[in-house]
Amino acid sequence: VATTVGPYARWGLPLVEACARAGTHYADLTGEVLFVRDSIDRFHDVAAASGARIVHSCGFDSVPSDLAVMVAAREADTRHGDPLAEATLVVVSAKGGVSGGTIDSIRNQVAVMAADPAKRSIGADPYALSPDRSSEADLGPQRDVGPPRYDRRLGMWVAPFVMAPYNT
């Protein structure tokens, strides 16, 4: 099943549950960290037992950065024998627009995080989707958020990608 209907926090969990229970593979376009965390917490074990693969974040929000970092990490290892320590993705131009579902998803996440400090903490945690958060290193303050700034290495002004914290 491939679904493109957001906000996933509102519409997605029943479909994830149905797929997990039926052993049916599932893919979506979500960038909603709270939805994905809920999906993992509630249905990972069910999906694993049934053989279903639940794959979130298969859209523009995540795929280009995921693939770019994967290729860069492989190259760092192949060329230098070292793991990739840091990556910066710069998008100079893009075409397309933002759907009403995306706007509604953003509104929903902002409202939920504003009302619930625990959810806000999840939304701000770059390891929120880690299967074992306690084993992850503390990297200190993340540079994925903040105001536009001039990047001397790139020689241009840059601003964080709205999905950068999620993709971290």
Segment roles from a protein language model:
Residues 18-22, 42, 46, 75:
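Alpha-helical structural signal in soluble globular domains
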Residues 7, 18-37:
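ADP-ribose/adenylate-binding Rossmann-like module
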Residues 1, 25-26, 54:
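Hydrophobic beta-strand scaffold residues
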Residues 1-10:
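Rossmann-like NAD(P)-binding element
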Residues 74-168:
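Active-site-lining helix/loop region of Rossmann-like oxidoreductase modules
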Residues 3-4, 29, 57:
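Structural motif
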Residues 46, 50-94:
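Adenosine-phosphate binding glycine-rich loop
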Residues 12, 30-52:
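Rossmann-fold NAD(P)-binding glycine/threonine-rich loop
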